[in-house]
Amino acid sequence: MNAVEIQGVSQRYGSMTVLHDLNLNLGEGEVLGLFGHNGAGKTTSMKLILGLLSPSEGQVKVLGRAPNDPQVRRQLGYLPENVTFYPQLSGRETLRHFARLKGAALTQVDELLEQVGLAHAADRRVKTYSKGMRQRLGLAQALLGEPRLLLLDEPTVGLDPIATQDLYLLIDRLRQRGTSIILCSHVLPGVEAHINRAAILAKGCLQAVGSLSQLRAEAGLPVRIRASGISERDSWLQRWTDAGHSARGLSESSIEVVAVNGHKLVLLRQLLGEGEPEDIEIHQPSLEDLYRYYMERAGDVRAQEGRL
């Protein structure tokens, strides 16, 4: 059974359609990255899964049931983009309050505070917390009750690099335990190693969904090969240019060649067999490259101007 099934869903507000025939599934124990510009339909999709909206057309199933089913809500955790708590309560009091509301065991509170790195500040009032600390408290709240499905909306907002890496490691552990996760983010660097698939929305339409290897194959973006310590650099540049490849020198003994149309292995064999390089680096298209490609294909001006 899929954790989430969205079938033929369109969402309208009056005469405005904000989602167009969306079909998207989330498997059990899968992490799906949901990406798109502001107004792409990410928030609407999250609200449909949370049961806060009913689709104008189509069907949404969460854990095999309607999203607003009480049994579903007890098994769902949600971290909103903007986290707000009672400022006069301590971190521990806040988490105990939410545990009671959710029917979760109070014994989880201290464990979760430790898990998100707030044990040292558990008895401080939330009004003294930094934005990053409030974000981590929000994550602890979302993890109450050991949810089967976790929705994370911009979870790295306000986190420093170390806290961000800790969050991704926590996501990895949750995935290993079988938790299904939808991670909605504008911050693309660092995400790709921690998701199973990416879904890219633009203008209310699903532009692409799949693993990064599937999206790379579909997009056909080039792979860049860099070799350093190579002998006869100029002859290699001439050879590849004559063969129709895009190549350039990076220094007196290093070069870069762009591999397109499945030529990566051919170029690597040539380099390793004849060039005797000291080092080779292979640069696959990143999640940012793929995002930009699909945004430009959809005609999103911000991507074309170089802004995510």
UniProtKB/Swiss-Prot annotation:
Protein localization: Cell inner membrane
- Domain of life, per UniProt, equals Bacteria
* Domain annotation ABC transporter: ranges: 4-228
Tell me which UniProt keywords the record has, alphabetically: ATP-binding, Cell inner membrane, Cell membrane, Hydrolase, Membrane, Nucleotide-binding, Transport
Please describe the relationship between pH and activity.
Optimum pH is 8.0-8.5.
Its placement in the membrane is given as: Peripheral membrane protein
Entry GO MF terms:
ATP binding; ATP hydrolysis activity
**Coiled-coil parts of chain:** none
Q: Which Pfam families match?
A: ABC_tran
Q: What SUPFAM superfamilies does the record tag this protein with?
A: P-loop containing nucleoside triphosphate hydrolases
Task: Tell me what induces its expression.
Answer: Induced in response to denitrifying conditions. Activation requires NosR and DnrD regulators.
Binding of ATP occurs at 36-43
According to the record, the protein's activity is controlled as follows: Inhibited by AMP-PNP. Partially inhibited by N-ethylmaleimide, orthovanadate and NaN(3).
* Principal place of residence: membrane
InterPro entries named in the record: AAA+_ATPase, ABC_transporter-like_ATP-bd, ABC_transporter-like_CS, ABC_Transporter_VariousFunc, P-loop_NTPase
GO CC annotation terms, alphabetical: plasma membrane
Summarize the protein's role: Required for the assembly of the copper chromophores of nitrous oxide reductase. Has ATPase activity. Could be part of the ABC transporter complex NosDFY.
> Assembly and interactions?
The complex may be composed of an ATP-binding protein (NosF), a transmembrane protein (NosY) and a solute-binding protein (NosD).
Tell me its family. Answer: Belongs to the ABC transporter superfamily.
Write the protein's name.
Probable ABC transporter ATP-binding protein NosF
Biological source species = Stutzerimonas stutzeri (Pseudomonas stutzeri)
